[in-house]
């Protein structure tokens, strides 16, 4: 039987952060999810429920999304990574495994880079290195840049095949299910998320990410073409690439197939990812 979620609102820096935790067993390192742009935490529940029920999972709405308050001022990825670390402190988590999806994949890269001792393993799904990337078609990017699909969920039913590809091209029901779970935080929160990634890139420090990393890519992703995930897997030293026969939201549409791949990766016993240099001997 699925574990119930524990919802909490965390107050940090005059910011209300809505969190959801699916409790698990202590023998598995908890998994922290960074969601896509505009996406409230409920949208990843189908993926969470496909994972091992013993795995504790932490999801949250970033500022301006879903049930989290919208900040008065814009933010950038380093500041949001810091806020996430403080949220984990508040919730009493030490080291976690991290998965980032699309926009959340950029934030996951920043978190793994800035807080290596907090991130044991890294999973990057349908994401890129930021400004240094091979973009999707202009029409698709223009649709993505508008918050309309989250402010007006019925809109996503019309554009989902074009922007998400994969199963959304074949099954209209998927778009309806997706739209039914949308909880908009408003246009300003969406624009703050766009601003967070404006001009940002990880390309110059990806080689410093030492965590074991699984890069997951859809082979029919209109938003982030496959070549971008190949670039991530090439630049991150301890990375492996796995290609999924689906589109941008394969984590949801192919949850039952993708979850075992992720669980196998997370449970592999490998050399400790974060190596701390020994102090120099005196003399």
From Swiss-Prot:
Keywords: Hydrolase, Lipid degradation, Lipid metabolism. One of its GO terms (cellular component) is membrane. InterPro entries: AB_hydrolase_1, AB_hydrolase_fold, AB_hydrolase_sf, PHA_depoly_arom. Its EC number is 3.1.1.-. It holds the Pfam family Abhydrolase_1. PROSITE patterns: LIPASE_SER. Residues 30-253 form the AB hydrolase-1 domain. The active site is at 102 (charge relay system). Gene3D superfamilies: alpha/beta hydrolase. One of its GO terms (molecular function) is monoacylglycerol lipase activity. It comes from the Bacteria. GO terms for biological process: acylglycerol catabolic process. Complements a mutant that does not degrade PHA; might be a lipase. Belongs to the AB hydrolase superfamily. Lipase family. PANTHER family: MONOACYLGLYCEROL LIPASE (PTHR43798), MONOACYLGLYCEROL LIPASE ABHD6 (PTHR43798:SF5). Pseudomonas oleovorans accumulates poly(3-hydroxyalkanoates) after growth on medium chain length hydrocarbons. Large amounts of this polyester are synthesized when cells are grown under nitrogen-limiting conditions. When nitrogen is resupplied in the medium, the accumulated PHA is degraded. NCBIfam families: PHA_depoly_arom. This is Poly(3-hydroxyalkanoate) depolymerase.
């Amino acid at each position: 039987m699925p574990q119930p979620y524990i919802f909490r609102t965390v107050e940090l820096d005059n910011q209300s952060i809505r969190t959801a935790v699916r409790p698990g067993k202590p023998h598995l390192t908890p998994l922290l999810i960074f969601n896509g742009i505009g996406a409230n935490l409920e949208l990843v529940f189908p993926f969470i429920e496909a994972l091992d029920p013993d795995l504790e999972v932490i999801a949250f709405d970033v500022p301006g999304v879903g049930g989290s308050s919208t900040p008065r001022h814009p933010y950038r990825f380093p500041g949001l990574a810091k806020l996430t670390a403080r949220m984990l402190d508040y919730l009493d988590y030490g080291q976690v495994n991290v998965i980032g999806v699309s926009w959340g994949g950029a934030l996951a890269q920043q978190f793994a880079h800035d807080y290596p001792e907090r991130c044991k393993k890294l999973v990057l799904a349908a994401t890129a290195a930021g400004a240094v990337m091979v973009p999707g078609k202009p029409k698709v990017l223009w649709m993505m840049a508008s918050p309309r699909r989250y402010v007006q969920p019925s809109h996503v039913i019309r554009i989902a095949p074009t922007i998400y590809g994969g199963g959304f091209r074949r099954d209209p029901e998927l778009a309806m299910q997706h739209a039914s779970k949308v909880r908009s935080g408003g246009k300003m929160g969406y624009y703050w998320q766009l601003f967070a990634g404006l001009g940002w890139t990880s390309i110059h420090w990806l080689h410093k990410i030492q965590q074991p990393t699984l890069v997951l890519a859809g082979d029919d992703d209109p938003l982030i073409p496959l070549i971008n995930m190949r670039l991530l897997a090439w630049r991150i030293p301890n990375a492996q690439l796995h290609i999924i026969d689906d589109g941008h939201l394969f984590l949801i549409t192919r949850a039952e197939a993708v979850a075992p791949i992720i669980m196998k990766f997370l449970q592999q016993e490998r050399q400790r990812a974060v190596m701390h240099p020994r102090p120099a001997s005196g003399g």
